[in-house]
Amino acid sequence: MSGLLVMPRILRCLNVSRISAILLRSCFLYGTFFGVITFRIERKDSQLVAINRRGYLWICLVIRLLASCFYGYSYDAWSGQYEDMYLRAFFGFRLIGCLICSVIILVMQFWFGEELINLVNRFLQLFRRMQSLTNSPKNRFGDRAEFLLMFSKVFSLLFVFMAFRLMLSPWFLLTLVCDLYTSVGTGMITHLCFVGYLSIGVLYRDLNNYVDCQLRAQLRSLNGENNSFRNNPQPTRQAISNLDKCLYLYDEIHQVSRSFQQLFDLPLFLSLAQSLLAMSMVSYHAILRRQYSFNLWGLVIKLLIDVVLLTMSVHSAVNGSRLIRRLSFENFYVTDSQSYHQKLELFLGRLQHQELRVFPLGLFEVSNELTLFFLSAMVTYLVFLVQYGMQSQQI
């Protein structure tokens, strides 16, 4: 009983926002180590700024090209041990998917490197403006929900090292390192999309909370203070100024989310397809060959967790954009101020057309329904494999 009473105190004392920021930093270092993130974050004039590193970019280019070439060259060596053509076809599709994602990473780093740097700086600027508007503490990211998602993501990133078995053969070690470097780079696309949409969701939630609590109280005061406006004009000016700031932030979040979607639309689709293919391949290999090892099924669970975390981050961002409509109508108060009405009409008109929806290549919507469809498809596929394996043994 005493433990149940102590647990809430521990959660209150635990600054989950700061821990989430530390976990986000660890994910950044993880992506930097595997050559996907080639910029650095520096503090200039008490502000965080993303700066490109051309030297490290070329180093990552050489390493990724060598790893991809050796990974493709060694395909015949390690896939020839399997006689099942279906399984070899799976390995071939995985090879093609990893190489395509590697090419996309190189294209984004070299041809869209400046756009990525500008996008990261716009994210950092939005968080600075949000912190200034809401007077929130520095070095924080989200709340308990974001902490749980970030903790699950870090666990998923670390689990990939447990799925590989080390052997003393130099050829096998070289093949393993190239496979790890290439496959982790492919998965980093999903991780970057997760962090991006989670950041958009945090921005929407913080701004919506500010509009719902503080800005609403300021706008309501316009009704009561409208008659005494001439005697005390400062509250009205402050409310209108904060309304302008909220308008700017909502519009900027929408523009940043659109730029993010345009950059990661195709990579996200290929990464999701690669995850589905990898799960089906590993499940087929484990069930039909009766290799129920922790490494194989743990890898399937890891890939499934990545997809679930991605859909949850997208869901938080989409819900934040949809909540704007209710908040905008709730903050519409009738006054005699014409400028106030013009700003609120602008507020209402813009936000009705800024709902966020994630459609990779326009083929499907990333949502919780996609997760349910994904789970049902996996269960059906696993049942089919079990039945197929049982019938094959009887024959």
Swiss-Prot record:
Any one GO molecular-function label of the UniProt entry: taste receptor activity
Cellular component GO terms, alphabetical: axon; dendrite; membrane; neuronal cell body; plasma membrane
Write out the topological domains of type Cytoplasmic.
1-18, 111-153, 205-267, 315-369
Would you say which domain of life the source belongs to? Answer: Eukaryota
Give the record's membrane topology.
Multi-pass membrane protein
Biological process according to GO: chemosensory behavior; male courtship behavior; monoatomic ion transmembrane transport; sensory perception of taste; signal transduction
**Stretches of the chain found on the membrane's Extracellular side:** 40-89, 175-183, 289-293, 391-395
The record's listing under InterPro entries reads:
7TM_chemorcpt
Question: Which stretches are annotated as coiled coil?
Answer: none
The function of this protein is: Probable gustatory receptor which mediates acceptance or avoidance behavior, depending on its substrates.
Name of the protein this chain belongs to: Putative gustatory receptor 93b
| Source organism (scientific name) | Drosophila melanogaster (Fruit fly)
Give the gene that encodes this protein.
Gr93b
